C-alpha cells in the first residue's frame, strides 16, 4: 500500500515551497512583528492570485475542488516559511465551515469572494481563559441578533467575516457575521506570537445568519476543529523540519578545533 503523496500533490508542494522561498516569507514574518499589521498584504495578495484560497472550494463556485491532502502539502510549506497570512483561520476554519454546513444561498454569496480575496474569514469560540465547552458558551443569539464577546480570535482584524459559536434557546449555533456592521467591535489582544494576531470580537445586536442546524452547532464546531488540527500539525511538521535543517547546516559549517562541530559525538 502506497501512503505517500501523489505526483500531483508532490508537484504542488514543490511549487509552494519554491514560491514561499522566493518571497522570503521568513523575513516577511520578522517585518510583520515590527508593525501592528499582523499581516503581509503583498504576500497574501499573491497567495490569493495563486488560487490557494480556493483549493477546497468546489468548482461550481469557482474553486479548484481539490481534497484535504492538497491542503496538507500547502500547510506544511506555510509552516516551513512562517508565512504571516490569515490562511489557517480563513481556509482551514472559516471556508471549511461554509463548504460543509452553510446553505446554498450563503455558499453562492461567500465562496466566490473567498477565492477572490474579497472575503477573509475566521472562527470565534473562546470567551474566557478556560478550555471552551458548550457549557461555558455565553454569547447569545435571539431573532438572529448576536450579543456577547469572544476573545483570542485569530486574524479577526484582517478578516471581513467570522463564524461565532453562540447559544440560543434551542442549543448551540454557528452564526455568520459581517465585521463591517457598526455593532461589531474588534480590539487587539497581547499574545506571545504576534506574527499571528489575536483579537476580541464584541457584538451588540449584530445581525447574523445560521450555519448548520439550530441544535447541533457544537458538534459541527468540533468537526471543523478536529479536521483543522491535522492541517495545523502539517504546519508544525514544516516548521520543525526547517529548524532541523538549519541545525544540520550549522553543524556542518561551524568549525571548532579545526573540524566541523557536527563531527563531534555530542552534536
Regions from the PLM with identified roles:
Residues 27-49:
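Short secondary-structure junction/hinge motifs that connect adjacent elements
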Residues 65-74, 133-136, 177, 203-206:
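Structural signature of FAD isoalloxazine-binding scaffolds in flavoprotein oxidoreductases
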Residues 124, 147-184:
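A short core secondary-structure module
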Residues 116-128, 164:
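A short, Trp-centered hydrophobic/proline-enriched beta-strand micro-motif
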Residues 3-12, 80, 186-267:
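Glycine-rich beta->alpha junctions and the first turn(s) of the following alpha-helix
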Residues 133-147:
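Cytochrome P450 C-terminal beta-domain/meander region
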Residues 48-108, 112-117, 154-161:
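Internal helix-loop-helix
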Residues 9, 20, 74, 103, ...:
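Residue-level signal for inorganic ion chemistry
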Amino acid at each position: 500500500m502506497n501512503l505517500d503523496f501523489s505526483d500531483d500533490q508532490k508537484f504542488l508542494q514543490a511549487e509552494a515551497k519554491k514560491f514561499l522561498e522566493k518571497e522570503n516569507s521568513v523575513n516577511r514574518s520578522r517585518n510583520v512583528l515590527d508593525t501592528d499589521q499582523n499581516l503581509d498584504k503583498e504576500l497574501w495578495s499573491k497567495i490569493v492570485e495563486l488560487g490557494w484560497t480556493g483549493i477546497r472550494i468546489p468548482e461550481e463556485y469557482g474553486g479548484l475542488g481539490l481534497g484535504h491532502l492538497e491542503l496538507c502539502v500547502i500547510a506544511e510549506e506555510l509552516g516551513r516559511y512562517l508565512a504571516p497570512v490569515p490562511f489557517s483561520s480563513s481556509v482551514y476554519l472559516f471556508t471549511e465551515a461554509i463548504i460543509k454546513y452553510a446553505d446554498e444561498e450563503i455558499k453562492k454569496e461567500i465562496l466566490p469572494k473567498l477565492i477572490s480575496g474579497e472575503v477573509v474569514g475566521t472562527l470565534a469560540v473562546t470567551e474566557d481563559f478556560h478550555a471552551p465547552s458548550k457549557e461555558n458558551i455565553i454569547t447569545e443569539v435571539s431573532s438572529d441578533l448576536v450579543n456577547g464577546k469572544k476573545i483570542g480570535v485569530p486574524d479577526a482584524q484582517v478578516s471581513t467575516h467570522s463564524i461565532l459559536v453562540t447559544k440560543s434557546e434551542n442549543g448551540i449555533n454557528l452564526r455568520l457575521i459581517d465585521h463591517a456592521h457598526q455593532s461589531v467591535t474588534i480590539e487587539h489582544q497581547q499574545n506571545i506570537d504576534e506574527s499571528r494576531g489575536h483579537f476580541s470580537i464584541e457584538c451588540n445586536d449584530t445581525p447574523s445568519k445560521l450555519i448548520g442546524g439550530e441544535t447541533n452547532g457544537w458538534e459541527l464546531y468540533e468537526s471543523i476543529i478536529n479536521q483543522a488540527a491535522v492541517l495545523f500539525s502539517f504546519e508544525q511538521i514544516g516548521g520543525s523540519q526547517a529548524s532541523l535543517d538549519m541545525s544540520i547546516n550549522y553543524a556542518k559549517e561551524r568549525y571548532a578545533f579545526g573540524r566541523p562541530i557536527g563531527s563531534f559525538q555530542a552534536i
